[in-house]
A protein has these predicted regions:
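Conserved glycine-rich beta-strand-loop-beta hairpin in the small C-terminal domain of fold type I
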Residues: 278, 294-303, 313-326, 360
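PLP-dependent enzyme catalytic core of the Aspartate aminotransferase-like
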Residues: 78, 157-158, 331, 340-349, ...
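Conserved PLP-anchoring active-site segment centered on the Schiff-base-forming lysine
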Residues: 110-132
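N-terminal small-domain helix-loop-helix segment of the aminotransferase-like
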Residues: 2-99, 106, 280-283
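Conserved core segment of the aminotransferase class I/II
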Residues: 3, 220, 225-296, 300, ...
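Active-site phosphate-binding strand-loop segment of PLP-dependent enzymes
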Residues: 144-213
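A short helix-loop-beta submotif of the ANL/AMP-binding
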Residues: 134-140
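A short helix->loop->beta-strand "cap" motif at the edges of active sites that frequently abuts
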Residues: 137, 194-197, 225-226
Length: 386
């Protein structure tokens, strides 16, 4: 008889609990203002609540189609056509997923095989690397450096090889709050040309873009979209992160492979919530057009409130995150500083180094401004005392 528990050999031995979970738990423990994890402290549109209740009452409580409710896929196709001038096929090209993270995982799993190389840009969202590792891929990283975090396209081209199968981009970019320009999208296309590789474009903050020229999507590029997967998030757009509904748009052949993975991960997504979102997209198309101004005001509240502090605010072109240089305040590294900030000052933030594989020597932290104005001002008051 075995005396000790059977412990599996980990496929992800170097990973623990995500920094977002850690910092939110620390914030709760010390009753700190939580500007760490990226979720709003206000609710989404009342209309969504009403439509959800309506569809529940109408009996839409069984499995949805594996690819997503038809009404929602049609609404997504129409929205995409309006914004990017391209209408994906709502039957073959759009897949509704349990949040954007599932779409990212399913796409990586579908496209990456053992030994394939995948390129991403650091700092990068922490779900990319585990998905690549679980597929047996080899992650190649290109460092983006502050304060502007622009892509070095010569370095990118030099990293390409016959084994390169996928490049993962994220714009607007979490955590740096930068956005790609149309010139970047074109540079990507020129670099990959006719290579047999794909593009995974994480565009979950597509409607939270403050750049004058707007959001540059791969879906607006006729050549790139033929080999690209674009991922978006209703949770980010409608302040409903707990609904965990996202989607991906890709050509039919790529979507077919993504769906093979999706059907054995979650099979389908919450039916009444999908129908409520379809109603929302139809009834209020002006909603997402107003989102940049909505978050720009929140960004400016926090930036202006920190103007008299010793903290340096980096440019924010998109997302609902703000990078802060605290080098004038402390010599602690960013992980130590965030812990101290939470425990002693009462404001929780995210250290930027956790988004990087290589040592990150910069003293930068990330704050989330998807909060009520009173929350932002209270946090800024504490930070101004540093």
């Amino acid at each position: 008889m075995r005396n000790n528990p059977l412990i599996p050999k980990s496929k992800l031995p170097n990973l623990g609990t995500t920094i977002f979970t850690q910092m939110s738990a620390l914030a709760q423990k010390h009753q700190a203002i939580n500007l760490s994890q990226g979720f709003p402290d206000f609710d989404g549109p009342r209309y969504l609540h009403e439509r959800l209740a309506y569809h529940v009452a109408q009996g839409a409580n069984q499995y949805a189609p594996m690819t997503g409710a038809q009404a929602l896929r049609e609404a997504i196709a129409d929205k995409t056509a309006e914004i990017y001038g391209y209408r994906p096929d709502d039957v073959s090209d759009i897949t509704v997923t349990a949040g954007a993270t599932e779409a990212l995982y399913a796409a990586i799993t579908a496209l990456v095989r053992a030994g394939d190389e995948v390129i991403c840009f650091d700092p990068s969202y922490d779900s990319y690397a585990p998905a690549v590792a679980l597929s047996g891929g080899v992650l190649k990283r290109i460092a983006l450096t502050p304060p502007h975090f622009r892509v070095d396209w010569q370095a990118f081209s030099a990293l390409l090889s016959e084994r390169t199968r996928l490049v993962i981009l994220n714009t607007p970019h979490n955590p740096t709050a930068t956005v790609w320009r149309q010139a970047d999208i074109e540079a990507l296309w020129q670099a990959i040309g006719e290579r047999e590789m794909y593009v995974l474009s994480d565009e979950v903050y597509e409607h939270i873009c403050f750049a004058v020229e707007g959001h540059a999507s791969v879906l607006a590029h006729p050549q790139l979209r033929e080999r690209a997967v674009a991922v978006s998030s209703f949770g980010k757009t409608f302040h409903m992160t707990g609904w965990k509904i996202g989607y991906c748009v890709a050509p039919a052949a790529i979507s077919a492979e993504i769906r093979k993975v999706h059907q054995y991960l979650t099979f389908c997504v919450n039916t009444p919530a999908q129908l409520a979102l379809a109603d929302m997209l139809r009834a209020a198309p002006e909603y997402y057009r107003a989102l940049p101004d909505f978050y720009r005001k929140k960004r400016d509240v926090l930036v202006n409130a920190l103007a008299q502090s010793r903290l340096k605010v980096l440019p924010c072109e998109g997302t609902y995150f703000l990078l802060i240089d605290y080098s004038a305040v402390s010599t602690l590294n960013d992980v130590e500083f965030c812990q101290w900030l939470t425990e002693e000052v009462g404001v929780a933030a995210i250290p930027l180094s956790v988004f990087c594989a290589a040592p990150f020597p910069h003293q930068l932290i990330r704050l989330c401004f998807a909060k009520q104005e009173s929350t932002l001002l209270a946090a800024a008051e504490r930070l101004c005392k540093l």
